[in-house]
Amino acid sequence: MSSTSEELLQKKCLPCEGGVEACSLEQAKSQRSAVPNWELRPDGKWIERSVRFKNFVKMIEAVNQIAELSEAEGHHPDLHLTGYRNLKIELTTHAIGGLSDNDFILAAKIDAILAQSGL
């Protein structure tokens, strides 16, 4: 069942040590509609977002905010910094080898952080 962005912002990531099914490709497509700035990889196992910041300092500020959020949620993205101001954010639930609700919850919360940066 898909959620809206507002609903995702109200949720908290739940610990996932495996033992649950990853979202199917159809479920992932449905959930992705709540986080339209994110791309779903063709295999349906990852979502990602690329962002270009005004400068290096603004990018690092956002990375630090994402790090704090990730620690609080207990769910962590892969972050790739390139070209001094480009950030690629990738989300998957490693324990299950695919996407879970946690990925979409964290994506919505990362979007809120990036919106504060004017992105």
PLM ranges: what are they?
Residues 1-119:
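Long, contiguous binding/interaction regions
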